[in-house]
């Protein structure tokens, strides 16, 4: 029988792992070992093999360990894909209906979490794209020309190029997290996003009910007259 492992289940598993790794009940360690690599491939650095999940392999790990380091709460963060804002790139926009039958435009992603609807700028500020210039003439959006840099609560355009993009500011990555966790392909999510008073205004602004921030016109219609007529 087939099963669907949803994105929400993956997020829950990640949260549970972080919670377990940072609690006082469990202890996690990172180790180095394998002092005699004669029998192993020299291409591991660029092409590591898939791990063998067996009791024999686990015994080998223990037998060849040299040193361990305990993982503390400051050593763990949840991570997301890193989309560094670049001029001329067409980004996806946030939509709650992305699926295999209704893919993101223009990336073709089959789920919200695999689409490129958020970016980080050169100052490590993170934004969600609420509108990517989609209109009846540009059904897959337009290239982004203005880098978002603002920290306003309300969504807005990043500049005056007229690229059609509307961005919403989320958070700024802490310098300590940048130094420890930032990489080419992934960036950290704040560990105190849900509790920090510094993020409270952004959280509250994003969760108020009854808001309509973006309206996208996908069909202008026909035969409806001009705007200066009375009906």
What residue spans do the PLM features occupy?
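Feature for peripheral, non-core segments
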Residues: 1-126, 130-231
